[in-house]
Regions:
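N-terminal beta1-alpha1-beta2 submodule of the flavodoxin-like/Rossmannoid cofactor-binding fold
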Residues: 1-84
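Short, glycine-/small-residue-rich phosphate/pyrophosphate-handling segment
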Residues: 88-134
Length: 134
């Protein structure tokens, strides 16, 4: 069985609720980035051992939370050893705004996965204005 980890930051609890549902659906281990943007050593080890990593962050001002960005920067240690090379990645975000530039956050998550040599998996959904999407 594949080992999946959901790593997320939640500022007000909304992203945590989504992360819990994603983890339940994927039978994944749930790892929360703390309020200072840190993870414990056991959490980093779990990420290294995972077959798939799912990122989660709220979108604030058109990007990921600073705590998630701190985690992303700290992941450079894994980058140097290519610890996440060829892992499968996905991600999610939310914001209080109907638009809120969540797309920019998702591109950032995809870029982070690509920096690590990962394989990004999208939802495969067509734009909602397409007749094929209904």
């Amino acid at each position: 069985m594949s080992k999946v980890v959901v790593v997320y930051h939640s500022g007000y609890g909304h992203t945590q609720r989504v992360a819990q549902q994603v983890a339940e659906g994927a039978a994944a281990q749930l790892i929360a980035i703390d309020a200072e943007g840190n993870l414990g050593e056991a959490d980093w080890a779990a990420l290294a051992e995972a077959d798939a990593i799912i990122f989660g962050t709220p979108t604030y001002m058109g990007g990921a939370s600073w705590q998630f960005k701190k985690f992303a920067d700290a992941s450079s240690k894994a980058w140097f050893t290519r610890a996440w090379q060829d892992k499968v990645f996905g991600g999610f975000t939310n914001s209080a705004s109907p638009v809120g530039d969540k797309g920019a956050t998702m591109i950032g998550l995809q870029t982070l996965a690509s920096q690590h040599g990962g394989i990004w998996v999208s939802l495969g959904q067509l734009p909602s204005n397409s007749k094929a999407a209904t």
